[in-house]
Amino acid sequence: MKLFLDTNVLIDFILERQPFYQAAAMVMSYAVEDKIQICVSSLSFVTTNFICIERCKMPIEIFRNKINFLREYIEVTSVDKTDIYNSYDSLWKDFEDGVQYYSAKRANADYIVTRNTKDFEENDIKAISLDETIKILKKYRENTNNP
């Protein structure tokens, strides 16, 4: 199973934002245990860096440590001109969400995990909340006989 994390989920995990952190950490734990694949767009890392360091004043050493940890478990998907043009040419209300969608599509993600599922309603990759993700992962674990 391959999950594409939207920027808000990555930020929730890195900043340990409540009440979202526990669910985000649980999703990450599945990747650490090699049960699933997680991908995040390069755009999300740029935005997350800005939010965490510039807006929230997270010390850069702490931010770098968290990113270094994630590097082992997350596939970074590229954003290319096709994603940009497709997002502009499509009917996406939010340009950034469109870019994320096209990056997830090229990565062959099964789901987009986001706190804003309504932003991704009309596409062929199902957008799910963190709570829905946990339910799906528990069923996935049962079906694959993983403890």
Predicted regions and their residues:
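Amphipathic alpha-helical segments within well-ordered protein domains
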Residues: N49, I53, Y85-Y88
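Short active-site alpha-helical segment characteristic of glycosyltransferases
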Residues: Q100
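Glycine-rich anion/phosphate-binding loops
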Residues: K93-E96
